[in-house]
Amino acid sequence: MQKLSEEMKQTIMDIFEHLHANPEVSWKEYETTSFLKQKLEDLGCRTRTFSDCTGVVGEIGSGSPVVAVRADIDALWQEVNGTFRANHSCGHDSHMTMALGTLMLLKKQPELPKGTIRFIFQPAEEKGGGALKMIEEGVLDDIDYLYGVHVRPIQETQNGRCAPSILHGSSQHIEGTIIGEEAHGARPHLGKNSIEIAAFLVHKLGLIHIDPQIPHTVKMTKLQAGGESSNIIPGKASFSLDLRAQTNEAMEALIAETERACEAAAAAFGAKIELHKEHSLPAATQNKEAEAIMAEAITEIIGAERLDDPLVTTGGEDFHFYAVKVPNLKTTMLGLGCGLQPGLHHPHMTFDRNAMFTGIHILANAVLKTFQKAESLAAANAS
């Protein structure tokens, strides 16, 4: 496989600088989509955009198999140096850059194998709905293999090392309402204090126990109750719960136990607790075939001594909706060690930008290896 030239590296770094300097939040990645579309077309891709959402898809080649590379494109809204603004603190600017760089590198190869290479620039990963929208739009219908990439913090792996898959956990966000009864502060026995009910619920949540061998947590992350007056016992409160589990099965059990805890807390006070499940993310589903291809690609580029085992992380990622919702799709996500610190989603997150070149070489190698595997299988079946 041909490698990136110094001229290509500079072009790739320029792309990153532009994307890094122009972050846009979920579902509002308008300029980002336009920029990516132009770059894809400049590189000879057929492109597709969507009438009711951001994001863009580009592809080269034709026929099967269809191998795809996915990059998320949205930024986070967070406080940076005292000002709230969009900020690429989850590395999506680097993911977009690596996907475009992979396309550039593949186009430089003397010959590409028969088949289609698709590049999916997906919106709204941070909101958890972008992957589902791409599935709804039929972007994944004919894909055989799908590869993603995510930069990893130093707490997980060192700069210069890579993992063939990232095993994210499942997450579930729940909004709840406590309906008690207001009363005068001097007559608490006539009311049902929603703050006391919430405190009891926090205690009940802490008593939830499922299989201890599977990492899991449930906690209240937001509580709002009462108004301007401190002498009124609040009858109503709203709260948020954040649930995490390393497997989808454990998440189902955790949700059931959480619902039981809420029922018990409400019954103890003769109150009501209403729950509304908001966005959720599935845990990763390991595909050994795609993972093995990625491991081979990593080994050829940086050596077996720098190949990590699959990374297990409690974070969530909507990339895994693709494996759950699309039958027979083979997926894996490259975990790129890049010296990222102090951590993902930190407003001042930094990483070694030269690591993107490693990611590009690995992704391009994985794509080529996938086609080679398909050709070998077809030849074996023909004989």
Swiss-Prot record:
It is an enzyme of class 3 (hydrolase). CDD domains: M20_Acy1_amhX-like (cd08018). Keywords: Hydrolase. Its EC number is 3.5.1.-. InterPro entries: AmhX-like, Amidohydrolase, Bact_exopeptidase_dim_dom, Peptidase_M20, Peptidase_M20_dimer. Disulfide bonds: none annotated. One of its GO terms (molecular function) is hydrolase activity. SUPFAM superfamilies: Bacterial exopeptidase dimerisation domain, Zn-dependent exopeptidases. It holds the Pfam family Peptidase_M20. Belongs to the peptidase M20 family. PANTHER family: AMIDOHYDROLASE AMHX, PEPTIDASE M20 FAMILY MEMBER. This is Amidohydrolase AmhX. It comes from Bacillus subtilis (strain 168).
